[in-house]
Swiss-Prot record:
This is Subtilisin-like protease 5. InterPro entries: PCSK9_ProteinaseK-like, Peptidase_S8/S53_dom, Peptidase_S8/S53_dom_sf, Peptidase_S8_Asp-AS, Peptidase_S8_His-AS, Peptidase_S8_Ser-AS, Peptidase_S8_subtilisin-like, Peptidase_S8_subtilisin-rel. It comes from Trichophyton rubrum. GO terms for molecular function: serine-type endopeptidase activity. CDD domains: Peptidases_S8_PCSK9_ProteinaseK_like. Residues 37-113 form the Inhibitor I9 domain. Residues 21-116 form a propeptide. SUPFAM superfamilies: Protease propeptides/inhibitors, Subtilisin-like. The lineage of its organism: Eukaryota, Fungi, Dikarya, Ascomycota, Pezizomycotina.
Length: 396
């Protein structure tokens, strides 16, 4: 089994009435938040119209409470750049009313994200040396700038910010899923260690910002992922770091228009975004956020420059990166080995942070730079899939 998240998401079957916004449906058996929905407004919705819509929703909330729908109403509001919307608990009649508002683009059920069990075994980290040597090698070769002055947003299961790997460079950003500011699965800490750990990391001087969207069972709603992206954009903008930030999401699943749209806004704002291609050995075009064309979608390679057997493939993939038997940090101290495209994506985030610091490129141009530096070395990458492997441009 391999390290990756799965979003049980949505098809494009419309349940809406004529001239109403689409209400996207979920496949049979999908796990969703009971009566939970994500509402996305049209791109041209003004701030004033959005405010008026929210006032109207507040009145609906009052009526739903009177009808006995406990906990009903808006739970999260998204208002950044070209994405305005919200998520919450609504009954069927209310959703029909919402979809009939001409300012609403679409409505989709709030699906549950779940974490897969990951492979763990002790083995030396080979990924760092591979990405800094064209023909492979045992040493990691890098510039001493090492990601200095760059922030890495890890949208995941949390990060053990006190781990010695981070040398005080990790901070807690936001928790959008529970009240436990810890990493209950170990996945987020492992990812952060690959990006910026002193031993296992690529950008060894970058700052890590933990954005928790998955609980100790490795689960959380799609609305929480969107909220995590929203928070990261706002936080980076507040500190003047949008073009000096990378955002990693080692998660994904079937197509979600809302998640793709939110992810694209981070890149438009100036950030680099890396995401996992997926672990089902299928075409990743049907997955989100991997199918969002503006993100850097990363597939997993092996020690021998082959496609990892579990890795997704397809034209949405931008690069391959090491994703098999990757050693990195573990919560509470020490290390552990994991495999998956979840491990490949942070390699790309780390190299992006490294190049942002070394070359001064803006974050949202880093994916193009990664592709320019990459090497066509992957054997049997899959149909209509790039053979290019991540490389940091060390000259070796």
């Amino acid at each position: 089994m391999t390290g990756f998240f799965t979003i049980l998401s949505f098809s494009l079957a419309a349940l809406s009435v004529t001239n109403a916004a689409q209400i996207l449906s979920v496949p049979k058996g999908a796990e969703v938040v009971p009566n939970g929905y994500i509402v996305v407004m049209k791109d041209d919705t003004s701030q004033q119209d959005f405010s008026s819509h929210r006032v109207w929703i507040s009145s609906i909330h009052h009526n739903m409470t009177r009808r006995g729908l406990d906990g009903a109403g808006v739970k999260q509001t998204y208002d950044f750049d070209h994405l305005r919307g919200y998520s919450g608990i609504f009954d069927e009649d209310t959703i029909k009313d919402i979809s009939n508002d001409p300012k609403v683009a679409f409505v989709e059920p709030d699906a549950i994200i779940s974490q897969h069990v990951v492979v763990q075994q002790r083995k030396a980290p080979w990924g760092l040396s591979r990405l800094s040597n064209r023909r492979g090698g045992r040493n990691y070769v890098f510039d001493s700038s090492a990601g200095s002055g760059v922030w890495a947003y890890v949208v995941d299961s949390g990060v053990d910010i006190r781990h010695s790997e981070f040398q005080g460079r990790a901070v807690w950003g936001s928790n959008l899923v529970d009240n436990k500011n810890s990493d209950g699965t170990g996945h987020g800490t492992h990812v952060a260690g690959t990006i910026a750990g002193k031993t296992y990391g690529i950008a060894k001087k970058a700052k890590v910002v933990a954005v928790k969207v998955l609980n100790s069972e490795g689960k959380g709603p799609t609305s929480g992922i969107i909220a995590g992206i929203n928070w990261s954009i706002r936080h980076a903008r507040k500190h003047g770091m949008l073009q000096k930030s990378v955002l990693n999401m080692s998660l994904g699943g079937t197509y979600s228009a809302g998640l793709n749209h939110a992810t694209a806004q981070a890149i438009k704002a100036g950030m680099f975004v890396s995401v996992s291609a997926g672990n089902d050995n299928i075409n990743s075009n049907g997955n989100s956020p991997a199918s969002e064309r503006s993100v850097c979608t990363i597939a997993a390679s092996t020690e021998n420059d082959g496609k990892a057997s579990f890795s997704n493939w397809g034209p949405a993939v931008d690069l391959y990166a090491p994703g098999h038997n990757i050693l990195s940090a573990r919560p509470g101290g020490g290390s552990q080995t994991m495999s998956g495209t979840s491990m490949a994506a942070p390699h790309a985030a780390g190299v992006a942070a490294y190049l942002i610091a070394k070359e001064g490129i803006p974050g949202n141009r880093a994916c193009l730079r990664l592709k320019q530096l990459s090497q066509p070395t992957i054997r049997n990458p899959g149909p209509d899939t790039t053979s290019r492997l991540l490389y940091n441009g060390s000259g070796r």
